[in-house]
Protein backbone atom coordinates (compact mmCIF):
# COMPACT_ATOMS: atom_id res chain seq x y z
CA UNK A 1 0.00 0.00 0.00
CA UNK A 2 1.25 3.51 -0.83
CA UNK A 3 2.59 5.43 2.16
CA UNK A 4 0.18 8.39 1.99
CA UNK A 5 -2.75 6.01 1.52
CA UNK A 6 -1.66 4.00 4.54
CA UNK A 7 -1.14 7.12 6.66
CA UNK A 8 -4.55 8.54 5.71
CA UNK A 9 -6.22 5.19 6.34
CA UNK A 10 -4.57 5.03 9.77
CA UNK A 11 -5.70 8.59 10.49
CA UNK A 12 -9.27 7.75 9.52
CA UNK A 13 -9.39 4.58 11.62
CA UNK A 14 -7.77 6.38 14.56
CA UNK A 15 -10.35 9.16 14.35
CA UNK A 16 -13.17 6.62 14.22
CA UNK A 17 -11.91 4.67 17.23
CA UNK A 18 -11.21 7.87 19.17
CA UNK A 19 -14.71 9.14 18.39
CA UNK A 20 -16.16 5.89 19.74
CA UNK A 21 -14.00 6.23 22.86
CA UNK A 22 -15.04 9.83 23.46
CA UNK A 23 -18.67 8.90 22.75
CA UNK A 24 -18.57 6.24 25.46
CA UNK A 25 -17.07 8.76 27.89
CA UNK A 26 -19.74 11.28 26.88
CA UNK A 27 -22.52 8.81 27.70
CA UNK A 28 -20.93 7.85 31.02
CA UNK A 29 -20.43 11.48 32.06
CA UNK A 30 -23.99 12.28 30.99
CA UNK A 31 -25.39 9.64 33.34
CA UNK A 32 -23.39 10.85 36.35
CA UNK A 33 -25.34 14.10 36.71
CA UNK A 34 -22.14 16.15 36.87
CA UNK A 35 -22.46 19.93 37.36
CA UNK A 36 -21.42 20.49 33.74
CA UNK A 37 -23.43 21.44 30.68
CA UNK A 38 -23.43 19.32 27.55
CA UNK A 39 -20.99 21.56 25.68
CA UNK A 40 -18.43 21.42 28.49
CA UNK A 41 -18.63 17.62 28.49
CA UNK A 42 -18.14 17.62 24.70
CA UNK A 43 -14.98 19.72 25.06
CA UNK A 44 -13.65 17.30 27.69
CA UNK A 45 -14.43 14.35 25.42
CA UNK A 46 -12.76 16.14 22.53
CA UNK A 47 -9.51 16.34 24.49
CA UNK A 48 -9.81 12.65 25.36
CA UNK A 49 -10.25 11.92 21.65
CA UNK A 50 -7.04 13.82 20.84
CA UNK A 51 -5.16 11.49 23.19
CA UNK A 52 -6.72 8.50 21.44
CA UNK A 53 -5.78 9.84 17.98
CA UNK A 54 -2.11 9.84 18.92
CA UNK A 55 -1.90 6.37 20.44
CA UNK A 56 -4.10 4.69 17.82
CA UNK A 57 -2.21 6.29 14.93
CA UNK A 58 1.19 5.41 16.37
CA UNK A 59 0.04 1.81 16.76
CA UNK A 60 -1.28 1.49 13.19
CA UNK A 61 1.79 3.08 11.56
CA UNK A 62 4.61 1.69 13.72
CA UNK A 63 6.09 -0.30 10.81
CA UNK A 64 6.19 2.59 8.32
CA UNK A 65 9.67 3.75 7.28
CA UNK A 66 10.65 6.96 9.02
CA UNK A 67 13.56 9.30 9.69
CA UNK A 68 14.26 10.55 13.20
CA UNK A 69 13.86 14.33 13.39
CA UNK A 70 17.05 14.64 15.42
CA UNK A 71 19.07 13.12 12.57
CA UNK A 72 18.29 15.92 10.11
CA UNK A 73 17.20 18.92 12.20
CA UNK A 74 19.34 22.06 12.21
CA UNK A 75 19.52 21.95 16.04
CA UNK A 76 19.27 25.73 16.36
CA UNK A 77 18.68 27.30 19.73
CA UNK A 78 15.20 28.64 20.39
CA UNK A 79 14.76 31.70 22.58
CA UNK A 80 11.69 33.31 24.10
CA UNK A 81 11.97 36.06 21.49
CA UNK A 82 11.97 33.45 18.74
CA UNK A 83 8.77 32.03 20.23
CA UNK A 84 7.14 35.46 20.33
CA UNK A 85 8.14 36.05 16.72
CA UNK A 86 6.66 32.77 15.54
CA UNK A 87 3.48 33.44 17.54
CA UNK A 88 3.06 36.84 15.88
CA UNK A 89 3.58 35.24 12.46
CA UNK A 90 1.00 32.59 13.32
CA UNK A 91 -1.55 35.09 14.64
CA UNK A 92 -1.01 37.44 11.70
CA UNK A 93 -1.31 34.68 9.12
CA UNK A 94 -4.36 33.29 10.88
CA UNK A 95 -6.02 36.71 10.84
CA UNK A 96 -5.62 36.96 7.07
CA UNK A 97 -6.61 33.36 6.32
CA UNK A 98 -9.60 33.48 8.67
CA UNK A 99 -10.79 36.63 6.91
CA UNK A 100 -10.58 34.90 3.53
CA UNK A 101 -12.35 31.82 4.91
CA UNK A 102 -15.13 33.93 6.43
CA UNK A 103 -15.83 35.54 3.06
CA UNK A 104 -16.00 32.15 1.35
CA UNK A 105 -18.20 30.62 4.05
CA UNK A 106 -20.50 33.63 4.12
CA UNK A 107 -21.13 33.20 0.39
CA UNK A 108 -21.57 29.41 0.61
CA UNK A 109 -23.92 29.51 3.59
CA UNK A 110 -26.01 32.43 2.36
CA UNK A 111 -26.46 31.46 -1.28
CA UNK A 112 -26.10 27.66 -1.30
CA UNK A 113 -27.37 26.52 2.09
CA UNK A 114 -29.42 29.59 3.10
CA UNK A 115 -28.10 29.48 6.66
CA UNK A 116 -26.34 32.00 8.90
CA UNK A 117 -22.55 32.01 9.12
CA UNK A 118 -22.13 30.91 12.75
CA UNK A 119 -18.59 29.85 13.61
CA UNK A 120 -17.80 26.19 14.29
CA UNK A 121 -15.19 27.11 16.90
CA UNK A 122 -17.52 29.62 18.52
CA UNK A 123 -20.21 26.96 18.84
CA UNK A 124 -17.70 24.47 20.24
CA UNK A 125 -16.14 26.58 23.00
CA UNK A 126 -18.88 29.15 23.59
CA UNK A 127 -20.03 29.39 27.25
CA UNK A 128 -17.58 26.66 28.33
CA UNK A 129 -15.85 27.57 31.65
CA UNK A 130 -12.33 28.95 31.26
CA UNK A 131 -10.78 26.25 33.45
CA UNK A 132 -12.10 23.51 31.18
CA UNK A 133 -10.80 25.33 28.11
CA UNK A 134 -7.43 25.79 29.81
CA UNK A 135 -7.04 22.10 30.64
CA UNK A 136 -8.58 20.60 27.51
CA UNK A 137 -8.04 23.09 24.67
CA UNK A 138 -4.87 24.87 25.82
CA UNK A 139 -2.95 21.98 27.41
CA UNK A 140 -4.11 18.46 26.49
CA UNK A 141 -5.10 18.84 22.81
CA UNK A 142 -1.96 20.76 21.71
CA UNK A 143 0.34 18.22 23.36
CA UNK A 144 -1.11 15.19 21.61
CA UNK A 145 -1.87 16.91 18.28
CA UNK A 146 1.75 18.06 18.04
CA UNK A 147 3.08 14.63 19.02
CA UNK A 148 0.91 13.10 16.31
CA UNK A 149 1.48 15.53 13.44
CA UNK A 150 4.88 17.08 14.21
CA UNK A 151 6.55 13.96 15.58
CA UNK A 152 5.11 10.62 14.41
CA UNK A 153 3.54 11.66 11.10
CA UNK A 154 6.27 14.15 10.17
CA UNK A 155 9.00 11.53 10.71
CA UNK A 156 7.09 9.11 8.47
CA UNK A 157 7.09 11.68 5.67
CA UNK A 158 10.70 12.88 6.05
CA UNK A 159 12.09 10.26 3.61
CA UNK A 160 10.45 12.44 0.91
CA UNK A 161 12.36 15.52 2.10
CA UNK A 162 11.71 18.29 4.59
CA UNK A 163 9.60 20.54 2.35
CA UNK A 164 7.35 17.71 1.16
CA UNK A 165 6.99 16.42 4.72
CA UNK A 166 6.06 19.87 6.01
CA UNK A 167 3.48 20.53 3.29
CA UNK A 168 1.75 17.13 3.39
CA UNK A 169 1.69 16.84 7.18
CA UNK A 170 0.25 20.36 7.37
CA UNK A 171 -2.40 19.60 4.76
CA UNK A 172 -3.45 16.48 6.70
CA UNK A 173 -3.49 18.53 9.91
CA UNK A 174 -5.89 20.97 8.26
CA UNK A 175 -8.11 18.15 6.99
CA UNK A 176 -7.97 16.50 10.43
CA UNK A 177 -10.06 19.37 11.86
CA UNK A 178 -12.85 18.42 9.45
CA UNK A 179 -14.35 21.85 8.75
CA UNK A 180 -13.70 24.66 6.29
CA UNK A 181 -13.57 27.36 8.96
CA UNK A 182 -10.31 26.02 10.39
CA UNK A 183 -8.88 24.47 7.23
CA UNK A 184 -6.62 27.24 5.91
CA UNK A 185 -5.25 28.54 9.17
CA UNK A 186 -4.59 25.08 10.60
CA UNK A 187 -2.57 24.26 7.47
CA UNK A 188 -0.60 27.45 8.10
CA UNK A 189 -0.16 26.51 11.75
CA UNK A 190 1.11 23.10 10.66
CA UNK A 191 3.70 24.72 8.39
CA UNK A 192 4.92 27.05 11.14
CA UNK A 193 5.08 24.33 13.81
CA UNK A 194 6.77 21.80 11.50
CA UNK A 195 9.42 24.39 10.65
CA UNK A 196 10.11 24.94 14.33
CA UNK A 197 10.53 21.21 14.92
CA UNK A 198 12.90 20.72 11.98
CA UNK A 199 14.93 23.82 12.81
CA UNK A 200 15.32 23.08 16.53
CA UNK A 201 14.90 19.30 16.66
CA UNK A 202 12.50 19.75 19.58
CA UNK A 203 8.76 19.03 19.40
CA UNK A 204 8.19 20.79 22.72
CA UNK A 205 8.67 24.22 21.13
CA UNK A 206 5.86 23.49 18.67
CA UNK A 207 3.72 22.35 21.60
CA UNK A 208 4.39 25.63 23.45
CA UNK A 209 3.48 27.65 20.35
CA UNK A 210 0.29 25.63 19.83
CA UNK A 211 -0.64 26.15 23.48
CA UNK A 212 -0.04 29.91 23.24
CA UNK A 213 -2.12 30.11 20.07
CA UNK A 214 -5.03 28.19 21.62
CA UNK A 215 -4.75 30.24 24.81
CA UNK A 216 -5.19 33.42 22.82
CA UNK A 217 -7.96 32.07 20.59
CA UNK A 218 -9.99 30.23 23.23
CA UNK A 219 -9.59 32.45 26.29
CA UNK A 220 -7.73 35.76 25.89
CA UNK A 221 -9.57 36.88 22.74
CA UNK A 222 -12.85 36.70 24.67
CA UNK A 223 -11.68 39.60 26.85
CA UNK A 224 -10.79 41.88 23.93
CA UNK A 225 -13.67 44.32 23.26
CA UNK A 226 -15.15 44.00 19.79
CA UNK A 227 -15.06 46.82 17.29
CA UNK A 228 -12.06 49.10 16.89
CA UNK A 229 -10.02 47.23 19.51
CA UNK A 230 -10.37 44.00 17.56
CA UNK A 231 -9.38 45.75 14.34
CA UNK A 232 -6.37 47.33 16.08
CA UNK A 233 -5.24 44.00 17.54
CA UNK A 234 -5.58 42.18 14.22
CA UNK A 235 -3.74 44.98 12.39
CA UNK A 236 -0.83 44.71 14.83
CA UNK A 237 -0.67 40.94 14.26
CA UNK A 238 -0.70 41.26 10.46
CA UNK A 239 1.89 44.06 10.31
CA UNK A 240 4.17 42.32 12.81
CA UNK A 241 3.91 39.04 10.91
CA UNK A 242 4.73 40.73 7.60
CA UNK A 243 7.82 42.44 9.05
CA UNK A 244 9.12 39.24 10.66
CA UNK A 245 8.60 37.16 7.51
CA UNK A 246 10.35 39.75 5.33
CA UNK A 247 13.33 40.02 7.67
CA UNK A 248 13.74 36.41 8.80
CA UNK A 249 12.10 34.10 6.26
CA UNK A 250 15.41 32.73 4.97
CA UNK A 251 16.76 31.87 8.42
CA UNK A 252 13.60 30.88 10.29
CA UNK A 253 11.78 28.82 7.64
CA UNK A 254 12.85 25.79 5.60
CA UNK A 255 12.22 26.76 1.98
CA UNK A 256 14.35 24.25 0.05
CA UNK A 257 15.13 20.54 0.23
CA UNK A 258 18.21 18.38 0.16
CA UNK A 259 19.13 16.66 -3.10
CA UNK A 260 19.18 13.08 -1.77
CA UNK A 261 15.53 12.46 -0.92
CA UNK A 262 13.05 9.85 -2.13
CA UNK A 263 11.05 10.93 -5.16
CA UNK A 264 7.45 11.72 -4.30
CA UNK A 265 4.93 10.70 -6.96
CA UNK A 266 1.93 12.94 -6.28
CA UNK A 267 -0.34 11.18 -8.77
CA UNK A 268 0.24 7.69 -7.37
CA UNK A 269 0.29 8.70 -3.71
CA UNK A 270 -2.93 10.72 -3.83
CA UNK A 271 -4.85 8.10 -5.82
CA UNK A 272 -4.63 5.47 -3.07
CA UNK A 273 -7.81 4.22 -1.42
CA UNK A 274 -6.74 5.49 2.01
CA UNK A 275 -6.33 9.09 0.85
CA UNK A 276 -9.55 8.97 -1.20
CA UNK A 277 -11.53 7.72 1.81
CA UNK A 278 -9.98 10.38 4.02
CA UNK A 279 -10.86 13.03 1.44
CA UNK A 280 -14.46 11.78 1.25
CA UNK A 281 -14.68 11.91 5.05
CA UNK A 282 -13.33 15.47 5.05
CA UNK A 283 -15.78 16.66 2.38
CA UNK A 284 -18.77 15.10 4.15
CA UNK A 285 -17.66 16.62 7.47
CA UNK A 286 -17.21 20.06 5.91
CA UNK A 287 -20.63 19.96 4.25
CA UNK A 288 -22.19 18.83 7.53
CA UNK A 289 -20.50 21.65 9.44
CA UNK A 290 -21.76 24.21 6.90
CA UNK A 291 -25.30 22.87 6.70
CA UNK A 292 -25.86 22.51 10.42
Predicted regions and their residues:
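Short, Lys/Arg-rich, polar N-terminal cytosolic tail immediately upstream
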Residues: 1-3
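Alpha-helical transmembrane segments
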Residues: 6-20, 84-94, 273-282
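Alpha-helical transmembrane segments of multi-pass integral membrane proteins
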Residues: 10-14, 18, 41-49, 54, ...
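Alpha-helical membrane-inserting segments
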Residues: 17-29, 52-60, 93-108, 196-200, ...
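Alpha-helical transmembrane segments in multi-pass membrane proteins
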Residues: 18-64, 231-239
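Juxtamembrane helix-loop-helix connectors linking adjacent transmembrane helices
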Residues: 29, 33-41, 70-144, 155-158, ...
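Membrane-helix interface linkers and caps
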Residues: 44-91, 95, 103-112, 243-263
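Transmembrane helix-loop-helix hairpins at the membrane interface
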Residues: 130-291
